Amino acid sequence: MTAIIDIVGREILDSRGNPTVEVDVVLEDGSFGRAAVPSGASTGAHEAVELRDGGSRYLGKGVEKAVEVVNGKIFDAIAGMDAESQLLIDQTLIDLDGSANKGNLGANAILGVSLAVAKAAAQASGLPLYRYVGGTNAHVLPVPMMNIINGGAHADNPIDFQEFMILPVGATSIREAVRYGSEVFHTLKKRLKDAGHNTNVGDEGGFAPNLKNAQAALDFIMESIEKAGFKPGEDIALGLDCAATEFFKDGNYVYEGERKTRDPKAQAKYLAKLASDYSIVTIEDGMAEDDWEGWKYLTDLIGNKCQLVGDDLFVTNSARLRDGIRLGVANSILVKVNQIGSLSETLDAVETAHKAGYTAVMSHRSGETEDSTIADLAVATNCGQIKTGSLARSDRTAKYNQLIRIEEELGKQARYAGRSALKLL
């Protein structure tokens, strides 16, 4: 009854107005699953590869080739398979692709099918996706990392770091956490406006003011937290996504906005000082993706008191994560389903992290859709943390709204991760 009888891929638009892949899967009993694939702006060199069309259509970013793969090769390979055999289906697609980075079929084609299959199987079983994937123990609502000021590749301003985030660690529920975030977001908007800054929002819903450096951004956020009636570090902690690969040149970190250059040791010391001065509890990609020595130095310096998250470093890849674990590098992994390209491999990366004592953070991409799958996956894996943008733009709030629904559905079983999500707090 859960055999796959139809797969339909189509080209839709993401939140940046670029094409992406959406997939529908239909089972023999009529169960249905739909998934849309996200896309990143700052991408790691070791990520799985999207299949794009090239040429003039959509300025080369069309995905008709990927859609053709879904409707042709992939359908032929898995039609008739049991949708509940997720591992087997994902492995069939990986083998069919045959490359190390999913460059033949395209990670966007494979992932769309992988997620849609899981959703169809969940519907067939009469379970919500988080329960189908995570089992009876899926009950932890994640602390959101809310990106409220943007810089780097996500903005046209002098700030070199890509994201400045707030984490409502002192809230008692996801519903309350979202309220904390919203109140700080709107307070920050007013303070920026009063100071003469533009308050338009960027790709992830955060503000992109013309501030001179990271400290100026952090000062605005700290003041806004206090003005909104919260205590920095107690009610709401701070986080950074440096996206350091984007400004790593010839072995150094080149801060064009600040007109400063820092070698890896100076970079680590700079981050350590920021963490100490501003209640920063998590730093993502503080070092470049292939600067393993720099990562090791940073981890040795502050890894016992600050969550150090590998995004471009690990690219949701269990093999790269195991390298990091062996070298004692970082202490957390960012989990992006499209970096690795299948649900099974995503779950494997989270499991690998947890077994090694690393934390895991479920994450969106800067190019998103209304698809809220990652909210369910955050609860399914009990990872305790989620990155899904600011408190604006429906492509971001869709995930928060889904978490609120899940919390309501779980009732007394629900537990908000709070401070325990970051093992060092």
Swiss-Prot record:
The lineage of its organism: Bacteria, Pseudomonadati, Pseudomonadota, Alphaproteobacteria, Hyphomicrobiales. GO terms for biological process: glycolytic process. Belongs to the enolase family. Its main location: cytoplasm. Its EC number is 4.2.1.11. Mg(2+) binds at D241, E284, D311. This is Enolase. Pathway: Carbohydrate degradation; glycolysis; pyruvate from D-glyceraldehyde 3-phosphate: step 4/5. It catalyses: (2R)-2-phosphoglycerate = phosphoenolpyruvate + H2O. The keyword Ligase does not apply. The active site is at E204, K336. InterPro entries: Enolase, Enolase-like_C_sf, Enolase-like_N, Enolase_C, Enolase_CS, Enolase_N. Its cofactor is Mg(2+). It is found in: Cytoplasm; Secreted; Cell surface. (2R)-2-phosphoglycerate binds at Q162, K336, R365, S366, K387. It comes from Brucella suis (strain ATCC 23445 / NCTC 10510). Binds a second Mg(2+) ion via substrate during catalysis. One of its GO terms (molecular function) is phosphopyruvate hydratase activity. Keywords: Cytoplasm, Glycolysis, Lyase, Magnesium, Metal-binding, Secreted. Catalyzes the reversible conversion of 2-phosphoglycerate (2-PG) into phosphoenolpyruvate (PEP). It is essential for the degradation of carbohydrates via glycolysis. GO terms for cellular component: cell surface; extracellular region; phosphopyruvate hydratase complex.
